[in-house]
Design a protein with these regions (language model features):
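A short, charged helix-loop
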Residues: 69-103
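Metal-dependent nucleotidyltransferase catalytic core
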Residues: 1-53
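Acidic, glycine- and histidine-enriched catalytic cores of nucleic acid- and nucleotide-handling enzymes
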Residues: 37-83
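Short secondary-structure transition/capping segments
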Residues: 20-26, 71-83, 131, 167-178
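Short, solvent-exposed loop/turn segments at secondary-structure junctions
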Residues: 4, 57-59, 148
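Short, low-complexity, polar/charged sequence segments that are solvent-exposed and flexible
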Residues: 15-20, 61, 70-74, 147
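Conserved nucleotidyltransferase catalytic core and NTase-mimicking acidic/glycine-rich helix/loop elements
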Residues: 91-205
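A short, terminal or domain-edge coil/loop segment
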Residues: 26-39, 78-90, 176-187, 205
Length: 205
């Protein structure tokens, strides 16, 4: 119930193994934490990675309800219901409202002008950075296209890592080509590919 002894020293972490890399987001200024609690991101010498978070008991219910994919492995004091079944519903593709759809389109096409500006001025990093932002909206639109085709009752995984399983091969290869940004010509081609994919995906939603 009292987390102070754990936070006073990190020595207890050695119980899990020899640590070769440790990050404590709550102690960082450049990368502040996004959630409640005190977390440790650990890599051990056998390359097993452990993400560990310490919470006060009164914060746990809120923490648990924020992500239904979390599973309780041990509840030695029987504080919580035993019938909690993990599920990934929090990560299912979200069906867009008309407003969200319009916002995505507006953001995507507005970003296009910044990519073009960077290319015309020979400012590669400026262009690439805004192309990255465009690609985020493209992925959002592609996920909606997939949702309308297959349903909104499943997840494409973190960072859309399973999206290729629902795309035509030629579309997937075209999407991958947008990451080839090692010349101004390739950045132009990436921009055009993003536009083509977005135009087609948005017309299907």
């Amino acid at each position: 119930k009292d987390t102070a002894p754990f936070l006073h020293s990190d020595s207890w972490l050695s119980f899990f193994g020899k640590i070769i890399m440790l990050q404590k987001p709550e102690d960082m200024e450049l990368f502040p934490p996004e959630e409640e609690g005190y977390s440790y991101l650990i890599i051990f010498d056998d390359y097993i990675k452990l993400d560990l978070t310490i919470l006060e008991l009164d914060k746990f219910k809120e923490y648990q309800s924020a992500d239904h994919l979390r599973k309780i492995l041990l509840d030695k004091d029987n504080l919580y219901p035993q019938n909690i079944i993990p599920n990934d519903t929090d990560y299912w593709i979200k069906k867009p409202s008309p407003r969200s759809f319009d916002d995505c389109c507006n953001e995507f096409w507005n970003l296009t002008s910044y990519v073009v500006k960077g290319l015309c001025r020979k400012e590669a990093l400026f262009a690439i950075d805004h192309l990255y932002l465009m690609r985020k909206e493209l992925l959002r639109m592609l996920s909606w296209q997939i949702g309308f085709k297959y349903g909104f009752n499943f997840s494409l995984g973190k960072n859309y890592k399973f999206i290729d399983k629902y795309m035509e091969t030629d579309h997937w290869l075209k999407f991958l080509s947008t990451y080839n940004n090692n010349s101004y010509n390739n950045i132009w081609n990436a921009l055009f590919a993003c536009q083509e994919l977005f135009r087609e995906a948005s017309s299907c939603c």
